Amino acid sequence: IKNGLVMFNKFTTAGLSFPVQGSAAFNGTSDFIDVATLPLSDFTNFTYSGWAYFNTASYQNIFGFGNTTNSTPVSLIEIQSGARINFFHRDASSQSVGVLSPAVNLNQWYFITATKEGTSHKLYIDGSISNTGSGSVPNPTFNTCSIGALNRVSLTNYFNGNLANVAIWNRALSSDEINSVMWKPVQALSATESNGLQAWYSLDDIASPTASLASMEQLATDK
């Protein structure tokens, strides 16, 4: 955990209109969460998802994997200049698949989901398919995982906004599952929905931000 994040309450934060108790605010310059234990080791099939609120539009990492000795391999969800969401997966030999959304609005909450199933890559915005891509990317080697910044040879692309319910599965969720999961806390997931869940970072502990931040690297064993 770096540079203690601010926890926001949905009843006092303007514009908050999504189904969790709060969120973590990232300042765009130094805040990020270093996930010490990588939640994935096999990148054949997976799902990344989470609620995101963007204050600005530039290259900002929502969630992703990197390598501190080689900047080429990455697997991430980010917002780019032009306010487009990008799901990008690349190995050390630069074989990659990128899936871009149309421009989104700033100062608005979105539920963003990226799925990979074999060579099929899909990007969902608020439960609806935004764009797809296809390609073979050999299993990359990563040694970092972070929320709110891209951690590779150097730390870059700090996130400016709020995040909540960032989650990782070792399988590709279906469209129906995504539309169900987006409205639930981890405790409400069905047995089917929690199948393959590797980690869930609520980022919403209002009563005890310190306790919440200290426990965010744990796997979602309470699902």
Task: Name the predicted role of every residue range.
Residues 182-185:
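A general structural motif at alpha-helix termini
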